[in-house]
């Protein structure tokens, strides 16, 4: 996990736990699937990424990028902007990881299967 903004409230261990739980909820084993990274960034960085990869010139709270290295070692990266977050950073880690695990949602996120999956993962991982 890389915290470029000094958020300091999400440890690498917790990020790993959340990503692994999201993958398990979809019947996947992160240890077998590969590595996923979580990066916390400033609004300008996420706006630039959102424009570059999605053609949307605005800030967003989370982006997920699927990757596959030559040996399948890298599942992808979840990029989060805490300053833009409409939900908690931990929720966004799970949200991004569910995207990496193959889930998607419509514009009406709160009515989606992905929302229910995210809520279930968060309930199971709350300390």
Question: Can you say where each PLM-predicted feature lies in the sequence?
Answer:
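An acidic/histidine-cluster motif and surrounding catalytic segment
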Residues: 1-93, 97-127
């Amino acid at each position: 996990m890389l915290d470029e903004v000094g958020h300091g409230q999400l440890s690498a261990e917790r990020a790993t736990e959340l990503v692994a739980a999201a993958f398990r909820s979809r019947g996947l084993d992160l240890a077998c699937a590969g590595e996923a990274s979580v990066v916390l960034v400033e609004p300008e960085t996420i706006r630039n990424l959102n424009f570059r990869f999605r053609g949307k010139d605005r800030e967003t709270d989370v982006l997920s990028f699927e990757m596959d290295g030559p040996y399948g070692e890298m599942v992808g990266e979840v990029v989060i902007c805490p300053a833009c977050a409409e939900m908690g950073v931990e929720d966004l880690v799970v949200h991004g990881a569910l995207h990496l695990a193959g889930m998607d949602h419509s514009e009406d996120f709160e009515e989606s299967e992905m929302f229910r999956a995210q809520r279930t993962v968060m309930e199971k991982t709350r300390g």
